């Protein structure tokens, strides 16, 4: 997960942010109960911050559009915004200590028939175990 700011947001031009910079900022977030939201809300609480959630959606594209066109911030998976990053419409910030990194596991029943599609998925997951951050990624410091 990374913090993201659209090209029209004041943070877009910054290379380094501090957690205190997030205080009072407007955010577009996933719905209540989302693991992404829970992880970020814990970070906000740990840092003693207060943010404003002005958008709430269960669709990543809706959240991304809010970031692009409404000067809000969000915390999202890097994998959801390659196109926008490549075309310099978004600036991303990664926490220094990588505390927002997540691990996913493929779980299946050992006695069930596995389809070729599942084997392909497993092969893809092993092929891309980690995602590289773009070189222009900003830093989020505490």
Question: Over which residues does each language-model region extend?
Answer:
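Hydrophobic hinge/microswitch elements
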Residues: 33-93
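Flexible hinge/capping segments at coil-to-helix
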Residues: 1-27, 31-32, 116
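Residues embedded in well-ordered beta-strands
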Residues: 2-4, 10, 73, 91, ...
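Ligand-binding clefts/hinges and TM-proximal coupling segments of bilobed small-molecule sensing domains
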Residues: 33-39, 43, 47-49, 119, ...
């Amino acid at each position: 997960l990374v913090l993201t700011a659209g090209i029209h947001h004041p943070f877009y031009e910054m290379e380094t942010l501090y957690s205190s910079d997030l205080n009072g900022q407007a955010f577009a977030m996933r719905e209540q109960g989302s693991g992404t939201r829970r992880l970020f809300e814990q970070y906000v609480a740990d840092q003693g911050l207060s943010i404003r959630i002005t958008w709430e959606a269960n669709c990543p594209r809706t959240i991304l559009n809010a970031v692009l066109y409404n000067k809000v911030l969000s915390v999202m998976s890097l994998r959801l915004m390659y196109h926008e990053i490549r075309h310099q419409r978004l600036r991303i910030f990664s926490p220094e200590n990588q505390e927002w990194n997540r691990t996913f596991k493929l779980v299946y029943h050992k006695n069930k028939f596995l389809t070729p599609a599942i084997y392909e998925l497993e092969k893809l997951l092993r092929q891309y175990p980690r995602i590289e951050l773009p070189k222009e990624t900003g830093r989020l410091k505490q």
